[in-house]
Regions:
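Glycine-aromatic micro-motifs
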Residues: 1-150
């Protein structure tokens, strides 16, 4: 079976620990999907975007390990693309963006580099999450000021 990773499981060293029998098939781009951050990696449908992914051949044991890691079925749902490739899709509001930790981001960055994936989408997802957090923070400040002055 095949698994498409777009977050921390793009990192070869991390996957070797989680799924020692997983075999990397290489880096690819999934059309019509955009990488986003909601503290951790997620994606959403976007006809103008591509999602960098690493394709892995995995075992049943690896799938169970990934299910546990991804919090399936509560945090992430598991689905198939083209009926063949497993991908985890985070549950909840795709508009609530939030930046990841530096260590988490760096792990993904290393995976992209190892598999020759362009990091433009990774940097754009981080920028979008940081901008969303700033707008949310300013909105909270304005709301607080209104309550104090109102």
């Amino acid at each position: 079976m095949y698994y498409m990773a777009y977050g921390m499981n793009t990192n070869k060293e991390a996957m070797e620990v989680r799924c020692p029998k997983a075999k990397p098939m290489g880096g690819f781009y999934l059309p019509n999907h955009r990488l986003i951050f909601r503290r951790v990696a997620d994606f959403r449908h976007d006809v103008d975007a591509i999602l960098p992914v690493v394709l892995w051949e995995i075992t049943e044991d690896c799938l169970r390990s990934l299910d546990n890691l991804e919090g399936y079925p509560d945090l992430y749902d598991r689905r198939k693309i083209n009926g063949e490739w497993i991908i985890y899709d985070m549950n909840g509001n795709k508009n609530q963006l939030s930046a990841p930790s530096g260590g988490y981001y760096h792990m993904i960055e290393q995976g992209y580099k190892y598999f020759g994936l362009d990091d433009y989408n990774l940097r754009a997802a981080l920028r979008d999450a940081e901008e969303h957090e700033q707008v949310s923070y300013l909105g909270d400040l304005i709301g607080l000021r209104s309550k104090v002055n109102g």
